[in-house]
Amino acid sequence: MNKLPERIRIKDIARLADVSVGTVDRVIHGRSGVSEASKKRVEEILKQLDYQPNMYASALASNKKYTFICLLPEHLEGEYWTAVETGIHEAIATYSDFNTSVKINYYDPYDYHSFENASEAILALQPDGVMVAPTAPQYTKGFTDQLQALDIPYIYIDSNIKDVPPLAFFGQNSRQSGYFAARMMMLLARDEKEIVIFRKIHEGIVGSNQQENREIGFRQYMKEHHPSCTILELDLHAERNDEDNEMLDEFFRTYPTVKNGITFNSKAYIVGEYLQSRGKKDFNLIGYDLLERNVTCLKEGSISFLLSLIHISEPTRP
């Protein structure tokens, strides 16, 4: 066998199999019009060379356009999902040669009807793929069942739902993250017997599946290693931030000896900025995500630790 170039080309395979380039192309792409004898020779050569098609070149040669839709929770500029959106748009710009485009639909994470309406709009468009941020499992399954019925691939970002498996998931293991956060909390708390969990709640609903799983992991660690530590809870309003300071004032009047707390959402800055405004420098606070206001609180000392993925780059992975 003559020496082959480092990068195997279709014409090299055609020469070795003694067939035309067109025949090799038809075999590689599973098209008809090839005799069994020629097909067998080509497949043997492909196997010997461990040939892998150049998907990038194939995509460039194709005129097909791909439309993806991403379903995200509604959010304000500068919040956690802003960075995720940035990553999505960067990915589309990076791989623009593949004729891809993306549309982002939004839903209210506290309103099932909002999610239902947004998902129905996506199904009507029948895109080539869907990215879902599944903040609530009870909202998601009906949607993904319909995607599967239409043979539309979907991936999860940020939060995973094991009972409804996607093509891929990009995010952290939320329960392990909460378990680790509890360990960090108790390194700060040492022998303290009380800690507090701060939540953002709307009509009894936590904003995301991810937050719930973080808390499950947190409580698991506490049960295993610090069962005598009392875990207090303060539920702040998800949509009425003007009342947060009053609720925090009332909490600390009721529990003046509590010196350690954690929040499992991305808005630790709400508590951090409150601590600054009240001059409370003896409170250890752990939060999530590198939002600008969180980082400012971290630098100024009102947040002790932030746990975060480098999430801006997550959606840009090929």
Where would I find each of the regions flagged by the language model?
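Flexible loop/hinge segments that line or gate small-molecule binding clefts
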Residues: Q138-Q176, L291-I303
